[in-house]
């Protein structure tokens, strides 16, 4: 069959569009947080999650049961429900598939779109507003699908009063029954039955009549979604899932094709692409022998002879499956998302081959689809021949199209409806789920059941229930859930501003950290233990977009946001060549031994000997790491000290004057390419070794200006990147710095410090008006967020007269990092609530060494806010490790250019992290990676459940179990008018804000007022509570607490000692109580009047 060029072009376009819907997750080593629904960001958040839910079968929001638990615990308050109903109640989303006929429907007339909030739903019943508010507070477990038939078929559910009915309402139902069945009630009184039995029978009769009234007038159930694949029709009509045959073969093919050197044997013809390798492997070497694969080898040999392209193969398969052209796009999309983890990884290798761990495979999504559809054609043909007959055709299953199409014929000649009993068919006459929900609500709410016997009011009641369906309720509950936390944070910012409007003391030293919310606690503890410090937050690559190659790296890696491609290469070069040679020789010997052992595993002749010898040799170290991980880690480090030490090294940051691209090793091991040549781990070349002096001056000046570091500098300025170290953790990169594309940002901090210390760079900065004197030295550092350690780079270069200041500063940082570990431990169930700080620090070090630890740290879990503004306004505010903190000084940004730059960088990065955790938490199976326990690394590209499943994308359950799924609240210190203008003028930001992917608030730079962006404009937030706990130190507040904590004021950050706290009037508990006491030390300070604040430090 000839295929028109326009069909091939259409298929190309369809595959390109479908590829955007696949998970954009990179291989494990380059894991970078992203919005799983990035392709739908042009839609409003609510519509996007609903669309994805329908397309992928995933959850859009938390379940009603989860929200009911939040209501019961006080996480959502009744006033939150009332507030969201007032503002969002009539815009809570469409009602999917359950519309009653327009006409005689009670309170709604023909053509009306919304019920009047103050109108009664039925005479004598609740108003529409009362109905919705009451319904939000009720969790009714409505049986669904076949479960509804099973639960209601025996009638037991229909004759018992629902458990949600209060005693008062139960008595009212009894009175209604007596009125309605007065004659029968008088006759039953003459019987010998007990009074309780008579009342029970009366209520049962009333409920039976109520059920009949509602069931009789219930609308038809919503039609099922139209089948998009022949597989869906075969499964529905015969109970046979053809994917169970196709997917295992496709998984093995993809695993072998994308393998990054783990497999002992390389896939034949891999260099020609997946489709060519598949044809040669199964067409010439032999296809599987199962009956469902009959004819596969012949078909593939024919494709080889005719040299079909992937596009032509796809077109042939769609025609062979008899898919109408108008359904091609839906069918292709459904096929790809059926195994979207592997399809997405193939697409990533096609789009970003530079992120392949070792060797990019020539992957194409079109090849993948051609293989998948070819397998589906063969399996479908053989399955239909077995189930229907040898002449069966795919079109015999019925059309792939809109609802209402003719149904396919089952092999037995019957339909599913014929298998139902007469009673079940009667139950299925209307929407059974809707009728049951209306039935329960009529019992619970203040409704006269006799009124519902009238057809008009029965329909009105059913319509009210349908209008306020689960989708609307869950959306409003989600808004109430977000509102409670948002109100707490905005209230706390206003209260903190009123209580502590003063400036901070001159600094002994300064420290710049990543904006990461895990650094919030470290900064807070540092400020508490050493109030003379000033801390700043910035994007973790610190403006240094580079490809980096350390001494231990085989090739360079990009350390910058994934949206950027570095043009400069920074390498680490040993100071002493002799030390380098000895070090590399020892590493090479160790690597050769490991390679020999690994290679032996894949060779049958050596497998038995390896298992006997290597197994015994590895038993003791394995047991030691499992039983005493920290001691085992120390032992490994002690043995490592017997090998040549890592040589002293420096970064090569300055480019040569001729700006020649680095096209070879050049003595540094760099593998940079010519223009257009792919550099694995980096992108397309060329890469130039180092930065020019002017470029370095621009990097330093831009960062210092952005974070508001102006005025005199302290003797030491730390720039501290971060990363995470753990063992047996496939998702380790997910715990590293998102701003460096899943890498560790310590090298960026080190490079920035080297630039800021460079004499020629300082001279260039002086020409720009920024003076950095000889009494200031920048020190790069690295914070390990898992074992809570700090390391510093190039400290031997610190001038002698500044070493005392460096020692004092590092001592303060050591204290802070120990307290940070102590705070982290409150979340770990394996740690007692009264653990000491030193013990806590040892515990987190042990977690990083434990091969059996599924929760080495919680990463970005619990992230919820991003505050862009001066640290002096949030200093001393306990934010529970939940807030990204970005330093910004609005007084030094008259035109808003700096704020625009920050919003365009920090908001997308924060939103990507936040939404990754959001979706992985609400649907750990559909969006998340599920539990870590069955994970198996495959080919260094991803993890599967066991030996053969789809690639699991997103975050593992153990990483998100304590996370509260909310959209990120971005709070910028700026006038509402300026912030609104920035949003309007920048489409990427406008899409995030107006689409509802993030929440945006403005914080007045000159007062405590905050404003929330809603419906295209800012509205002033009205605080509900300005009295928050006041504590001496953070540990007095969180000690003994496992759950999330609201904000609190911490006095130690302002240099106030516990003794001073005890002397304050209004002290309820001694502030000097031990950290193990779960007290709040609720010291109430007098509130200051709202109004302009004193001049602030520009920090």
Curated annotation (Swiss-Prot):
Annotated residues for binding of Zn(2+): 514, 516, 722, 737
Biased amino acid composition, Basic residues: 176-194
Transmembrane portions of the chain: none
Superkingdom of the source species: Bacteria
Cofactor(s) in the UniProt record: Zn(2+)
Localisation per UniProt entry: Cell membrane
Chief site of localization: membrane
Region (Disordered): 175-194, 1071-1099
Membrane topology per record: Peripheral membrane protein
Coiled-coil region: none
GO molecular function: zinc ion binding
Keywords: Cell membrane, Membrane, Metal-binding, Transport, Zinc
InterPro entries, A to Z: DabA
GO cellular component terms listed in the entry, alphabetical order: plasma membrane
UniProt KW Transport keyword: yes
Biological role stated in the UniProt entry: Part of an energy-coupled inorganic carbon pump.
Family statement drawn from the similarity comment of this UniProt entry: Belongs to the inorganic carbon transporter (TC 9.A.2) DabA family.
Oligomeric and partner information: Forms a complex with DabB.
Name this polypeptide is given: Probable inorganic carbon transporter subunit DabA
Name of the gene encoding the protein in the UniProt record: dabA
